[in-house]
Every structure is written in structure tokens, then in C-alpha cells.
């Protein structure tokens, strides 16, 4: 090889290296750009929400001021438990109960079929504890319900609010225990109980421990309603299904439902497969069920506090 040929080879190699470095630099810039875009999308998600019905883009602050009702079509979006507590409770009167109660994985439940929520875990490596931890971080709650004592237009009440954003509002041992303790305290202090239901039913990861909560809560309510003659109002929101519908959801002295809520025990597909026949559309929606006598009232969110206050007045409950 001549000296001239050697220099030409060096120039070719240098050019290839330069192109490679430029490509790597460009790829790195694209990656950083995409990363920045994802951060911007995260910020957008905290500021805007999309209506599940009409797909309108809704500004979160205005949506909360409108009690999570779409201003375009009137559709009721899901509310978290903290926002729901603010609806009926007077300002600075809320005193939460059992905030530090959390679930123990007594069954050592492990599912390979559940989707993974953690970046560093594959679904087959993720346990029930991992799922609980994920939702605790996402919602800021220890489990799928908040309970406490507050005042509604000056009337002391015991209030429990389920949160569907925490594992679909499923009822496990902690949810059942918190509701039972709330009812027992209300019974001891002669307070009315209001339960806001939003749940997919019993929590499968806790097996019979979850199913046992249905009987435990019903037993506490029996003493509250039958023995002490105290008022219990159940408010059903979308969705209320499964073991919650089959227990305390339908045990209220007065049962209130939100408009167009999905309320059921089993889903439509399960019913059709069991009965071997088709069922009509929307047969598990509030308005259809109300027409068949399952509820006492259908109340919109903006009227709820006034309606509850009037019911308490008719019941003769004293202001504090």
C-alpha cells in the first residue's frame, strides 16, 4: 500500500467515525427532546381531563368547581374521596378516623395475571403488597375508603366515602374494619351514618377475609338501625357493584343514587351467560332501576347537601 492510499483510507475511517458520532449525538438529542415532551404531557394531565362521554377537554380547576360534572354534556365523572367529602361537610369540621390502618397480605396473594404498575417489576414478580403500595402512592390513601366525623349544616354526622381510584374501590379487610368502626362510633354517639359507595365489590386478593366484611358491616348496621333506631343513608355512585351492592349499599333507611350511575351485582355479560338470554341495554343504570323501586331518590351532586340537610330536619336531628 502506498502512502497516498494509506492517507485516503484514514480519511474514510475518520469520516465514518464522524458520521457515527453525529448520529449518536442526534439520537441523544431526540431522546432528551422526547423526555421533555413526556414531562410536558404529565403536566397537561394534571391540568386537563377528558370527558368519558363526549370526549370534551375539561380544565381540572373548573371541573372540580362544577363537582366533576361535564359542562358540555352533563356527564358525571368519577370523583376522588377527598372531593366527595367536601360536598356535604361544613368547612373545618371534618375529623378523620383510622387514617393509619393498612392492609396485611395474610394470604400471601400472588397473581401472574394482574398488570404491573412498577417500572422495575414484571407482572409475574408483583405481589398484592406491591399493588397496594402502588395505589397508596398514586392516591395518597392507605386503602379504598376515608371515614370520619363531621358536620352537615351544623348537624354532626358519621361519613364514609369509598374511593374507586384505589384498586377499583374494592372492599378488603381494612375497608370493612373502617366502616364497622365508623358505624360503632356513630351508634355510641347517636349519630346518623352516611355511606358513599363506589366499588367493584369484594377484593379477590383477600379471599374469605374480604367476603366476611359483608356480614360484619351488616351486623353493625343492624344494631345501629334496629336496636338504636338511628338513621343510615346510603348514596350509590358509579360504579357500585358486587359485594358492596349485596351488603351495606342496599341496607340504607334511605337509598340515594346519582344520575346515570352504573349499579349492579353481577355484570351484564355474566348475567347473559348465566341465564342464557340477552338483557336490555342500560338495565343496570340508575333511572331504569329507580323505575323498578330499587332507590328512594335520584339526586344530583349540586343538590345533595341540601337534600341530606332536609332529610335530617324531617328526621328531627338536632344541630350542634
Swiss-Prot record:
Textual note on the cofactor: Binds 1 zinc ion per subunit.
Positions of Zn(2+) binding: 51, 54, 70, 73
Gene3D superfamilies: 2-enoyl-CoA Hydratase, Chain A, domain 1
Keyword Zinc-finger in annotation: yes
ZnF endpoints (C4-type): 51-73
InterPro entries listed in its UniProt record: AcCoA_carboxyl_beta, Acetyl_CoA_COase_Trfase_b_su, ClpP/crotonase-like_dom_sf, COA_CT_N
Keyword list, A-Z: ATP-binding, Chloroplast, Fatty acid biosynthesis, Fatty acid metabolism, Lipid biosynthesis, Lipid metabolism, Metal-binding, Nucleotide-binding, Plastid, Transferase, Zinc, Zinc-finger
Main localisation: plastid
Catalytic activity: N(6)-carboxybiotinyl-L-lysyl-[protein] + acetyl-CoA = N(6)-biotinyl-L-lysyl-[protein] + malonyl-CoA
Boundaries of every CoA carboxyltransferase N-terminal domain copy: 47-320
Pathway of action: Lipid metabolism; malonyl-CoA biosynthesis; malonyl-CoA from acetyl-CoA: step 1/1
GO CC annotations, alphabetized: acetyl-CoA carboxylase complex; chloroplast stroma
EC top class, as a word: transferase
Domain of life: Eukaryota
Record-stated family: Belongs to the AccD/PCCB family.
Oligomer status and interactors: Acetyl-CoA carboxylase is a heterohexamer composed of biotin carboxyl carrier protein, biotin carboxylase and 2 subunits each of ACCase subunit alpha and ACCase plastid-coded subunit beta (accD).
NCBIfam families (UniProt xref): accD
Protein name: Acetyl-coenzyme A carboxylase carboxyl transferase subunit beta, chloroplastic
Organism per entry: Pinus koraiensis
Amino acid at each position: 500500500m502506498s502512502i497516498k492510499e494509506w492517507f485516503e483510507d484514514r480519511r474514510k475511517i475518520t469520516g465514518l467515525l464522524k458520521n457515527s458520532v453525529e448520529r449518536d449525538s442526534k439520537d441523544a438529542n431526540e431522546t432528551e427532546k422526547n423526555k421533555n415532551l413526556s414531562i410536558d404531557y404529565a403536566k397537561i394531565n394534571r391540568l386537563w381531563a377528558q370527558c368519558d362521554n363526549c370526549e370534551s377537554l375539561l380544565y381540572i380547576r373548573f371541573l372540580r368547581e362544577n363537582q366533576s360534572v361535564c359542562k358540555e354534556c352533563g356527564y358525571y365523572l368519577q370523583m376522588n374521596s377527598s372531593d366527595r367529602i367536601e360536598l356535604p361537610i361544613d368547612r373545618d369540621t371534618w375529623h378523620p378516623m383510622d387514617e393509619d390502618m393498612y392492609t396485611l397480605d395474610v394470604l400471601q396473594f400472588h397473581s401472574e395475571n394482574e398488570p404491573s404498575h412498577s417500572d422495575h417489576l414484571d407482572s409475574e414478580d408483583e405481589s398484592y403488597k406491591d399493588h397496594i403500595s402502588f395505589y397508596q402512592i398514586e392516591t395518597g390513601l392507605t386503602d379504598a375508603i376515608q371515614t370520619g366525623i363531621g358536620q352537615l349544616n351544623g348537624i354532626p354526622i358519621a361519613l364514609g366515602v369509598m374511593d374507586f381510584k384505589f384498586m377499583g374501590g374494592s372492599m378488603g379487610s381494612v375497608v370493612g374494619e373502617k366502616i364497622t368502626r365508623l358505624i360503632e362510633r356513630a351508634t355510641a354517639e347517636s349519630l346518623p351514618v352516611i355511606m358513599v359507595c363506589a366499588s367493584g365489590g369484594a377484593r379477590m386478593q383477600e379471599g374469605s377475609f374480604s367476603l366476611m366484611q359483608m356480614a360484619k358491616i351488616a351486623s353493625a348496621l343492624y344494631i345501629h338501625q334496629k336496636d338504636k333506631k338511628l338513621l343510615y343513608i346510603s348514596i350509590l355512585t358509579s360504579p357500585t357493584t358486587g359485594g358492596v351492592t349485596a351488603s351495606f349499599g342496599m341496607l340504607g333507611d334511605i337509598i340515594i343514587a346519582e344520575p346515570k350511575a352504573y349499579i349492579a351485582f353481577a355484570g351484564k355479560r355474566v348475567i347473559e351467560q348465566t341465564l342464557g338470554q340477552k338483557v336490555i341495554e342500560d338495565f343496570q343504570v340508575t333511572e331504569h332501576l329507580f323505575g323498578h323501586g330499587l332507590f328512594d331518590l335520584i339526586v344530583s351532586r349540586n343538590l345533595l347537601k341540601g337534600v341530606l340537610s332536609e332529610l335530617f330536619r324531617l328526621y328531627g336531628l338536632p344541630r350542634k
